[in-house]
């Protein structure tokens, strides 16, 4: 059984037992979370979501991704600036997919 959920402005295909990386959400490690915006379950397509469907998961880790370097550079001018950014993420283990 699989489902497509919408979280953090993205659509993610999930299955029970799978661990996924999503945009940071509030919560501590081992907190239970429920995803309510289910777009599809096993080929049943929602309009736009499936009413009463839920995907339950557990937060495994809150962390930050690898640092990326952003360089601002203007030729022929004395402007050369380097910025760093680490995107926060949440690692979630999918426990259960239920359709009403």
UniProtKB/Swiss-Prot annotation:
GO terms for molecular function: rRNA binding; structural constituent of ribosome. Keywords: Ribonucleoprotein, Ribosomal protein, RNA-binding, rRNA-binding. PROSITE patterns: RIBOSOMAL_L21. Pfam families: Ribosomal_L21p. The keyword Manganese does not apply. GO terms for cellular component: cytoplasm; ribonucleoprotein complex; ribosome. The keyword rRNA-binding applies. One of its GO terms (biological process) is translation. Belongs to the bacterial ribosomal protein bL21 family. PANTHER family: 50S RIBOSOMAL PROTEIN L21, LARGE RIBOSOMAL SUBUNIT PROTEIN BL21M. Part of the 50S ribosomal subunit. Contacts protein L20. This protein binds to 23S rRNA in the presence of protein L20. This is Large ribosomal subunit protein bL21. It comes from Mycoplasma capricolum subsp. capricolum (strain California kid / ATCC 27343 / NCTC 10154).
């Amino acid at each position: 059984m699989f489902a497509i959920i919408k979280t953090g402005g993205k659509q993610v295909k999930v299955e029970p037992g799978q661990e996924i990386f999503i945009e940071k959400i509030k919560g501590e490690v081992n907190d239970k979370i429920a995803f309510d915006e289910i777009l599809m379950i096993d080929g049943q397509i929602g309009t736009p979501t499936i009413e009463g469907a839920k995907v339950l998961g557990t937060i495994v880790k809150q962390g930050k991704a690898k640092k990326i370097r952003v360089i601002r550079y203007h030729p022929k001018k004395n402007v050369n600036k380097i910025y760093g950014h680490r995107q926060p993420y949440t690692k979630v283990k999918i426990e259960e997919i239920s359709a009403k």
